[in-house]
Regions:
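C-terminal regulatory/interaction regions
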Residues: 253, 262-276, 280-288
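Divalent-metal coordination cores built from histidine and acidic residues
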Residues: 1-66
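Generic structural signal for well-ordered alpha-helices
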Residues: 10-17, 56-57, 84, 106, ...
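Active-site gating loops and adjacent loop-to-helix segments of metal-dependent hydrolytic enzymes
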Residues: 37-64, 108-120, 131-144, 186-216
């Protein structure tokens, strides 16, 4: 969910929880408003605010029983509250993102319990040879790191370098879409939270050239990762199944086909075109050829 006033965040949570249909939501990611204004991307600046646990705890309660995941800019978790640690102890999880934090601040956030980096490299402090920033720490630590593999947010060579860097830590490379409501729609002019943008050939930008989000879907992200990194399907699939499930703390019941786990299965053709979807053992979608 994007940065918004608290009442709108509540409405979005309630809508998500009531509109699952055939889909199954593992949790809700509150990407704003606890981010850095300088690294806000297309989040509305006037709604950005400091993280206070009293407010965050109410959001966690509203999201329950789903898992609550928050993006936090850790340089703003220095008000004596220890918000990151409190979120983790309350059963939520934290990703580091939309941040200008230096490496030491990121290191402290990870020690406090942050588990991941939100859309790594995008809207975060850059890697430099004497100050690795959040981008460098995403590669140098065992935390999970999310990547938007659409060829727009990140160059293919950047994706390949990041994938190889994360290999030594196991399955910590997480494929995400960061898709916005215009994903899957024709090219044209759209609006998101009052921000006008144009979608053209898969790229969604404001008139100033700021990327609003992606038009990516997971099958395309998997195919792109295979191409960018020259890896087989079975390895790319781990980045869209096992890794995100482990990041969300639900790999004991989701993220792989195994005895005792949920019977959630997507059946695809050779180009990952979705043919059938099974949720909890029930067929909820079958393509009509």
């Amino acid at each position: 969910m994007n940065t918004a006033p608290l009442d709108k965040i509540y409405r979005a949570i309630d809508t998500i929880k009531s509109a699952a249909g055939g889909a199954k939501f593992a949790g809700i990611h509150v990407e704003g408003p606890y981010i850095d204004k300088e690294k806000r991307g297309c989040h509305t600046e006037s709604f950005i605010r400091e993280p206070h646990f009293d407010e965050i705890s109410q959001i966690i309660e509203r999201i329950a029983p789903l898992h609550a995941h928050f993006t936090i800019a850790p340089e703003h978790d220095d008000k004596g509250e220890g918000v990151i640690n409190k979120i983790v102890r309350s059963g939520g999880s934290v990703g580091i993102g939309h941040t200008g934090a230096d490496a030491e601040t990121v290191r402290r956030a990870l020690a406090d319990g942050a588990v991941s980096f939100t859309h790594t490299f995008n809207a975060m402090s850059e890697f430099r040879h004497r100050e690795p920033g959040a981008s460098g720490m995403a590669l140098a630590t065992a935390a999970f790191a999310e990547f938007i593999c659409d060829g727009i947010h990140l160059a293919p060579e950047t994706v390949e370098a990041a994938y190889n860097a994360k290999l030594r830590f196991g399955d910590k490379f997480v494929l995400i879409t960061d898709s916005i409501p215009s994903a899957g729609l024709p090219d044209g002019d759209y609006d998101m939270n009052g921000i006008p943008f144009t979608l053209f050939r898969g790229k969604a930008c404001t008139s100033a050239g700021t990327i609003v989000g992606s038009a990516l879907d997971i099958p395309t992200a998997i195919l792109n990762l295979m191409k960018f990194c020259d890896i087989p399907l079975e390895k790319a699939l781990l980045c869209a199944t096992k890794a995100p499930a482990e990041m969300a703390g639900i790999y004991d019941r989701e993220g792989s086909l195994d005895i005792g786990k949920s019977a959630d299965i997507v059946i695809c053709d050779e180009r990952l075109g979705i043919q059938k979807v099974i949720v909890s053992g029930i067929m909820v979608y079958e393509r009509n050829n």
